[in-house]
Design a protein with these regions (language model features):
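Phosphate/nucleotide-binding beta-alpha loop and adjacent structural elements of enzyme active sites
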Residues: 1-293
């Protein structure tokens, strides 16, 4: 499900995904409540927002300054996240939020989504990009509090030590700049996960972990739950199972070149989890699921 209030972006997305029957694009805005809002369309459409954006990032002080100039204003109809879910009869497992400053208000007014949601990725700020005063701490603090209250754990941040830089006098492969915003990822906490009696939900969580660079936790959960779900044999004909199995196999295969890793341990953990033969050497390279071309 993709939600886009900007007409031009909505048309672009509809065209991009028109061949995908399982992808739906909605021309809606999401806000803290059902309302009409003014959307500021920036020269860089990806930064468009209903809020006034402060120019505090040095990345937009030079030749990129024009990107945060308002090109036009459009009026949009918005729904609360809960009402959007209700009106479209959705059950949301995962959520990606990038609404240029409204993330906190949207989630603080949402309750229904937390009854089904297993993981979330959201843009977060650590500076007063959209704040009204100089002491605004950004959105991360309030978002993290909301997630903790709903039994979520912070998985990771996309931040890799490379922030918004203030001059060219830096070493590109080192840490530099100031962290102003990034994406944060949360998942349901482990106590919730290990209480699950639904292996489909478990595999959805594991898939989310894989897609968010958390193979260690994915393998830990699969290993701990393998006996409970009888090596997941009820799922072994599904695309979900196959995605997880092949992803874990590829990950373990890459580890063999890292000092201290043992292929025998990779074989042991894979076969314990899935109850299938661990492929190595030519068996791995010749497998059409792993290397289809």
């Amino acid at each position: 499900i993709l939600i886009e209030p900007d007409k031009n972006e909505y048309i672009r997305l509809k065209k991009k995904y028109k061949k995908f029957n399982d992808i739906k694009v909605f021309k809606d805005g999401i806000a803290e409540k059902d309302t009409n809002m003014t959307l500021n369309i920036f020269e860089n459409p990806a930064m468009s927002s209903s809020l006034n954006r402060k120019n505090i990032s040095p990345l937009f002080w030079g030749e990129r300054k024009s990107q945060i100039r308002i090109k036009k204003k459009v009026y949009i109809k918005c729904k609360s996240l809960d009402n959007f879910i209700l009106s479209n009869k959705l059950q949301v497992d995962f959520l990606k939020l990038d609404v240029e400053g409204l993330e906190t208000k949207i989630l603080e007014s949402s309750n229904k989504i937390f009854k089904t949601m297993l993981g979330i990725r959201s843009e977060v700020s650590f500076a007063d990009i959209f704040g009204k005063n100089k002491n605004d701490p950004g959105s991360f603090v309030d978002l993290h509090k909301k997630m903790i209250e709903n039994n979520f754990t912070l998985l990771n941040l996309d931040y890799d030590g490379k922030g918004d830089y203030f001059s060219e006098y830096l070493i590109s492969n080192s840490r530099y700049g100031v962290l102003q915003n990034t994406d944060a990822v949360w998942i349901k906490n482990l106590s919730f996960i290990f209480r699950l009696n639904d292996e489909v939900k478990l595999f959805k969580i594991v898939s989310f972990l894989i897609l968010n660079n958390a193979y260690d936790l994915a393998i830990f959960i699969l290993n701990k739950s393998s006996s409970k779900f009888k090596k997941y044999k009820s799922l072994d004909k599904t695309n979900l199972y196959n995605f997880v199995k092949i992803s874990i196999l590829k990950h373990l295969y890459k580890l063999k070149w890292i000092p201290g890793q043992k292929i025998s341990n990779h074989k042991k953990i894979f076969e314990k989890i899935f109850g299938e033969k661990y492929l190595s050497m030519n068996e791995y390279n010749e497998n059409v699921e792993i290397n289809p071309y």
